[in-house]
Curated annotation (Swiss-Prot):
Organism: Caenorhabditis briggsae
InterPro entries: HATPase_C_sf (IPR036890), HSP90_C (IPR037196), Hsp90_fam (IPR001404), Hsp90_N (IPR020575), Ribosomal_Su5_D2-typ_SF (IPR020568)
Subcellular location: Cytoplasm, Perinuclear region
One Pfam entry name: HATPase_c_3
Single Gene Ontology MF annotation: nuclear glucocorticoid receptor binding
Quaternary structure, from the entry: Homodimer. Interacts (via TPR repeat-binding and central region) with pph-5 (via phosphatase domain); the interaction promotes pph-5 phosphatase activity. Interacts (via central region) with co-chaperone cdc-37 (via N-terminus); the interaction inhibits daf-21 ATPase activity.
Known function: Molecular chaperone that promotes the maturation, structural maintenance and proper regulation of specific target proteins involved for instance in cell cycle control and signal transduction. Undergoes a functional cycle that is linked to its ATPase activity. This cycle probably induces conformational changes in the client proteins, thereby causing their activation. Interacts dynamically with various co-chaperones that modulate its substrate recognition, ATPase cycle and chaperone function.
Record's protein name: Heat shock protein 90
Sequence ranges of Acidic residues compositional bias: 236-245
GO terms for cellular component: cytosol; HSP90-CDC37 chaperone complex; perinuclear region of cytoplasm; plasma membrane; protein-containing complex
Amino acid sequence: MSENAETFAFQAEIAQLMSLIINTFYSNKEIYLRELISNASDALDKIRYQALTEPSELDTGKELFIKITPNKEEKTLTIMDTGIGMTKADLVNNLGTIAKSGTKAFMEALQAGADISMIGQFGVGFYSAFLVADKVVVTSKNNDDDSYQWESSAGGSFVVRPYNDPELTRGTKITMYIKEDQVDFLEERKIKEIVKKHSQFIGYPIKLVVEKEREKEVEDEEAVESKDEEKKEGDVENVGEDADAEKDKKKTKKIKEKYFEDEELNKTKPIWTRNPDDISNEEYAEFYKSLSNDWEDHLAVKHFSVEGQLEFRALLFAPQRAPFDLFENKKSKNSIKLYVRRVFIMENCEELMPEYLNFIKGVVDSEDLPLNISREMLQQSKILKVIRKNLVKKCMELFDEIAEDKDNFKKFYEQFGKNLKLGIHEDSTNRKKLSEFLRYATSAGEEPTSLKEYVSRMKENQTQIYYITGESKEVVAASAFVERVKSRGFEVLYMCDPIDEYCVQQLKEYDGKKLVSVTKEGLELPETEEEKKKFEEDKVAYENLCKVIKDILEKKIEKVAVSNRLVSSPCCIVTSEYGWSANMERIMKAQALRDSSTMGYMAAKKHLEINPDHAIMKTLRERVEADKNDKTVKDLVVLLFETALLSSGFSLEEPQSHASRIYRMIKLGLDIGDEDIEESAVPSSCTAEAKIEGADEDASRMEEVD
């Protein structure tokens, strides 16, 4: 030890922190390299900043870089930078005797279960070196002081001594003596992997000293020896004959020689810091692939910077296709990487992007956020809220750009339409803008249409936008609900995606036009005076039948009314304006964790609407008026109700009793007697259930109705 070496004790909190780092098992020890490179980058930032006003500061070394040197023989890893360097006082104070404000906070966070990777966010990243090293030596040279060396084996104290390192004209060199069980951190492959993951876009070259091999030609000594032996055996030789030719004939062989050279690990300069006009599509594609691990090129890109009170740059990509696990709960909420002044802070930063935009990949590089920001601080950060607002706005612009190309937008919508609909459900601020991107099949043609196009085709007397939700386009197109609307020449939007149900709950109107479901009560179609008059007359004429049907069905329906929406169907089931549609009920029944109490009151409000112009309803009305207690009426009403449930998209609570009624009708149609039924394959329980009071004597009358 040098005579001038001084020993210092670590401040109590720092000693405690080091003990915690050394004696606790952490799985992600690799973060030590990120922290030391980040510190080196900060030191380079400082000297670059000083040189703006005092260019002579760079006389001690113009090149600004970070160099990593692994030495497998001595089991050391050295990280050197040509940054501002530290004076003796800096070494003593910053690396041991004065605790940073974050030291205690970080220890408390660690003991509460925080991740070790947050160490840099508390300003104590240097000590992460002890995750992989049992001794650390720091040599540093500042322009205002001589060169000094700091050394510690984390035993509660450290030593500082004058030390001259010819390689270090300015900057800091950290040498770590790697623990026996951590030697894989000396592997070239491992170092490259960590740098690529955490420090790929640091604004200074990161060089790695790599060992390489090259072939070298040397004289083959064995061949020379054997030739000498041949000569000794007595061959006659002309000594003076062409000595040069003899020289040429000397045997050589190739050997492999090891040598060391610097390899730059972060040649990809942060693409987002460059001018978008200077970046080719190929460069964007290459960067997108390295960022997202996607094998395909991106669909669209948005590259922008915001300046003023708040400064940040961002690069956002829309992929070609959605990942298969896009909406899985365990999946990270988004794919945005956050950098602060080119230093990587975290990936999947949830606060930067709403969940419905989780498919957007990209980076955000802020000039204003502090480098030591933690996830907790992010949640409170006003700067982040402003960045988020700007990012969402730029995403809307990106979607606008994609929509300019119809084919491109079609691809995009097939993959990410669900996200846009989820956005309408969740993001009230951008709901209006998002609604412009919706596309639906309609009754007017094969091509999906936007709401804007729908409105442009609306009839003069049409004041509402009509839509129907259902399982598939084929099902909704054949639905009884669209009969009258289509026959009047009004266009109906076909919403066949389960998420559409949630979407239209929030999207009440578009361009001042209310969205109206044709499956719910209160459907108002433009009518002439004559039609209005007929409708009122039908209501009076069918009042008695409506009452009888309500009495028969009791609690199964809330009310029975004359319909203005049916043409060829005898009846249909509609729901109240604020209740669930048949499609929504189907979706909710499929939920494994559904709330049965909600199911009870949301699904109960069903209304039966009857078609006054249909032969079945006319005959049924006559039957009721002739004999209020006609025994076939009850069974016919139940059968009509259950059939209407099915055709309206609902499921039956008792499918077996419905099947039994159908079998009974088939029996009557085929004129089969009871004794044949008993011999058939229908179970006796079904037959018992299917027994209809007074069926035999009224068989002929049912056939008439049929």
